[in-house]
Amino acid sequence: MEEAKHIEAVEAKQIEAEEAQRIKAGEAKQIEAGETSRSSRKVITFEPKLVINKGISVLGFVLRLFAVFGTIGSALAMGTTHESVVSLSQLVLLKVKYSDLPTLMFFVVANAIAGGYLVLSLPVSIFHIFSTKAKTSRIILLVIDTVMLALVSSGASAATATVYLAHEGNTTANWPPICQQFDGFCERISGSLIGSFCAVILLMLIVINSAISLSRH
């Protein structure tokens, strides 16, 4: 009888130990499931932010690429503008070129500087696409972008006054319009001015894009 009781006690202890192991195993599985669900939730909330950040960086690169064409194209169009006509009334050869007017020279220099900077900033913009956590380089680009925006805007504004006088003249100052004689010259400078103002708009969008990108870091 004592041996039977001893065997029953041992079996009961074994059953209790097995039940305790089962309980511990169930708790471990629940903990692992909870950790897995939490990690999956973290991934779900992180991926959309990463995609948006990359999209902002790609948009910034595209804007810079178009701004390169706008600034360099305007500088080349203005810098190669010249025209010669023969005045039938005075029988003399009249020549005009952009370097005759200081405001147009400033326009060319401003757009050339901005275009050169934008070309150099393209590799950095590509780097930002693959490294969305970069912050210092974004701050530097934002500061220089703002300076280039001011430079191109001032150049375009100064050239606008000259182009207006070329088309309309100024009767008060007794300045006749020259576009009646130099129509090709006026068409070129007007076209380059339009391209420069498009570059100004693109630079504004670049600054806004850079500011948004920084605010998300």
UniProtKB/Swiss-Prot annotation:
UniProt name for this protein: Casparian strip membrane protein 6
Alphabetical keyword list: Cell membrane, Cell wall biogenesis/degradation, Glycoprotein, Membrane, Transmembrane, Transmembrane helix
Coiled-coil residue spans: none
Cellular component per GO, a single term: plasma membrane
Localization, UniProt: Cell membrane
GO biological process, one term: cell wall organization
Glycosites: 170
Subunit (UniProt): Homodimer and heterodimers.
Keyword Cell wall biogenesis/degradation listed: yes
Primary location class: membrane
Membrane topology, record value: Multi-pass membrane protein
Physiological role: Regulates membrane-cell wall junctions and localized cell wall deposition. Required for establishment of the Casparian strip membrane domain (CSD) and the subsequent formation of Casparian strips, a cell wall modification of the root endodermis that determines an apoplastic barrier between the intraorganismal apoplasm and the extraorganismal apoplasm and prevents lateral diffusion.
Residue numbers on the Cytoplasmic membrane side: 1-57, 125-138, 213-217
Record-stated family: Belongs to the Casparian strip membrane proteins (CASP) family.
Spans within the Extracellular topological domain: 79-103, 160-191
One Pfam family it belongs to: CASP_dom
PANTHER family: CASP-LIKE PROTEIN, CASP-LIKE PROTEIN 1U1
Species of origin: Arabidopsis lyrata subsp. lyrata (Lyre-leaved rock-cress)
TM region(s), chain numbering: 58-78, 104-124, 139-159, 192-212
InterPro entries: CASP/CASPL, CASP_dom, CASPL
